[in-house]
Regions:
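Interaction-mediating elements
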Residues: 1-289
Length: 289
């Protein structure tokens, strides 16, 4: 005969040693209920979830232990679990590495190709310019001793800021391939590594329009105020289309008009933009209360 021993039932979970993150927030990530069977992988899975939560708050040296104890000697099938946490200190950022930024230079001096300087110096200036786009993710140095510890949410916002910077510099196809955060060799700080794909730096080649009956192409192009040969900027393009051109229709009562741009690459560094306009019906005001 084969005897199968049932997994014990969970009676209670206790969190001990936590000062920076409240019990409620920790228990929310554990996804448990009192009375459930304690499966063999539940404890390890729970410890990993707690560890992930702490790392997102900047506590990369957190240590977690778990102890399972029966509620009493007679009832060994109802167990309490205690997670003991040694939070450690929040870790500062020792270095930020942006891989994949070698094709293009950024920063006023680095972009002046007529100024003779070593390639390494240009790359260093570019890295400095790119790091400056990360508003809240900063390397701690002796002159920036106030730099905050790593914060996952702020880092996510900073990645968006880096993407916006590239797209405003003409790199419409810019992509962040991956990002990672890990200890330095002696665990004295964190290394933030961002792998990127810059893509081509685009300029406008041609503009074309369809669906426009209220305005001729010359009027629309004048309102757009973008010229052939201009470097693409996502912020500038969005303003030109969805504010400047769109306002022509809004001012005449076409509140539901729609402008949709389509991009077609032309060669390595140029693109054509075709605008499809759906003017829809004019909106009239019936009553004003």
């Amino acid at each position: 005969t084969i005897e199968v021993e049932e997994s014990p039932v969970l009676a209670k979970i206790t969190i001990d040693g936590n000062k920076k993150i409240r019990d409620k927030k920790i228990k929310e990530v554990l996804s448990y209920r009192v009375g459930m069977r304690i499966k063999p992988n539940f404890i390890n899975s729970s410890m990993n979830k707690i560890r992930k939560l702490y790392k997102e708050e900047g506590f990369f040296l957190v240590e977690i232990n778990a102890i399972t104890t029966p509620i009493d000697r007679k009832n060994t099938q109802r167990n309490n679990i205690t997670f003991t946490i040694n939070e450690g200190k929040k870790m500062k950022i020792k270095d930020i590495i942006i891989d994949g930024s070698g094709k293009n230079n950024f920063g006023w001096l680095a972009t002046k190709k007529w100024i003779p300087m070593p390639r390494l110096l240009r790359e260093t200036m570019t890295q400095y310019k790119l790091r400056r786009q990360l508003k809240d993710t900063k390397i701690r140095t002796w002159w920036r001793f106030w730099a905050s510890p790593f914060d996952k949410k702020k880092f996510t916002d900073d990645l968006d800021a880096l993407s916006n910077f590239y797209k405003d510099e003409g790199h419409r196809d810019f992509t962040i391939l991956s990002d990672s955060v890990y200890y330095s060799k002696k665990k004295k700080g964190l290394i933030v590594r961002i792998n990127i794909l810059e893509g081509s730096k685009y300029k406008f080649r041609n503009f074309s329009w369809e669906g426009n009956s209220l305005y001729g192409e010359n009027v629309l192009q004048s309102a757009l105020n973008l010229n052939k040969g201009d470097i693409f900027s996502q912020t500038g393009f969005d303003k030109a289309v969805f504010q400047d051109v769109q306002s022509l229709y809004m001012d005449r009562g076409y509140l539901y008009s729609n402008i949709e741009p389509f991009f077609t690459p032309a060669g390595k560094d140029s693109m054509d933009v075709h605008f499809s306009i759906t003017e829809n019906n004019k909106v009239y005001v019936r009553n004003i209360n």
